[in-house]
Amino acid sequence: MNWLYDLLPLPGTTVLVALGALALGITAGVVGSLAVLQQRSLVGDAIAHAALPGIAVAFIVSGARDSATLTIGAVIAAAVAAALILRLQRTPRLRADAAIGVVLAGAFSVGVVLLTWITGSGRGDQAGLESYLFGQASGIVESDVTLSFILMAIALIAVIVLTRILRAVTFDRTFSAAAGLPVRFAEAASAALLVIAVVVGLRMVGAILMVVMLIAPAVAARQFVTRLSPMLALSGLIGAVVGVSGALASSAAGVPTGPVIALIGTATAVLAVLLAPHRGVAWTARHRMRARSRLRRTELLLALDHAQPAAPRVPDAVAGDMGRSVRWVRRGLGSLQRAGLAVVANDAVTLTEAGRREAQRAREAVLAWSAWIEHGWRLGLPDAREPDPLNLAGSLGDEMAARLARMAREDPAHAAVR
């Protein structure tokens, strides 16, 4: 690893921390995606907390504080906790969240008691055990990084080999069981992957903050992709970026690495939820505002064009006919004016020629949507739940939209509307 120290213009400790964070980010990102999709993300939190008593018992039994011994203890305790959670979740009268809570609280309590007893024993070699609570990345050595990359490789290979089974169980457990797939094996494999991710992250972010690395990259990736394989890849990439950037930022600021990584991961997930295209809160709010504006404009066009499109109408009268407030109507009229569809003069509104053509198109689109509702089942169409009836061609294609329009024109029930 000396060549890497020479290649990067960073202190050796910073390089080690960044590499450890890289392995953690990739492992937690990929494994956490499966946990989030399976609604088992808190199982990872419980396993992380359950690793503490294993570390404490390993130290008490061996009397040594070397990483290998403590890692073995963490693996055993985490595996026992995972098996216990799976067993309790199959108990008919015990909810899944209750099983997780029992294991998490019980194991963490035992871990805190043992760590407190070890600290009060006065043994000189017990210093640093409490770092497994919040992580102490500055204390990792090359052997820790090597172990992290080995565990990362094992986790990635397992995910690749078991992708088909994991995908089926993740999205439809009942169907998978009916199809004869090894559902319990898949659940055990998912729990084992969580154990691996937790062991990789204990030294970096600690037992308490480990859940952030399992959830945040997966939540962020979920906002951008809809398929499992791209989500696993993107989540691993996001986790790697979060881990490395957190390690470098904490080194530059001289603050603990674990909390910084957790903060960056949380910020990344929040920003993705807010700003992601098509799914983000901001994009959805903007889309709904535009949809409401289009709907208001369409309602006004149809109302103004219903009787005498060329005759001026007073906004107050239009509001009364529509059952809307005058303020609502005037806001819509402003939109029509800006689009060149209406003219307001002396507090009277008149549709322009373009406005009358637009009203006619809107009326035909609404009639076609009505035809979809009434006759769509004959054409093998899905339920008419299209949020924008003015853009049926975008959902059904030009040919099918034109066919619905013809059916609407030929339907005598719509003659009065036309």
What are these model-predicted stretches?
Residues 309-418:
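Structured cytosolic domains appended to multi-pass membrane proteins
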Residues 33-122, 221-235, 248-260:
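Short loop segments and helix-boundary regions at transmembrane helix junctions
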Residues 18-23, 71-76, 98-102, 145-150, ...:
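Hydrophobic alpha-helical transmembrane segments
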Residues 1-25:
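Membrane-interfacial amphipathic/re-entrant helices at transmembrane-helix boundaries
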Residues 3, 104-159:
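Transmembrane helix-bundle core of multi-pass membrane transporters
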Residues 141-212:
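Helix-loop-helix "hairpin" substructures at the membrane interface of multi-pass membrane proteins
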Residues 264-306, 401-405, 409:
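Membrane-interfacial segments at transmembrane helix termini in multi-pass membrane proteins
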Residues 26, 30, 49-50, 105, ...:
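Hydrophobic alpha-helical segments embedded in the membrane of multi-pass proteins
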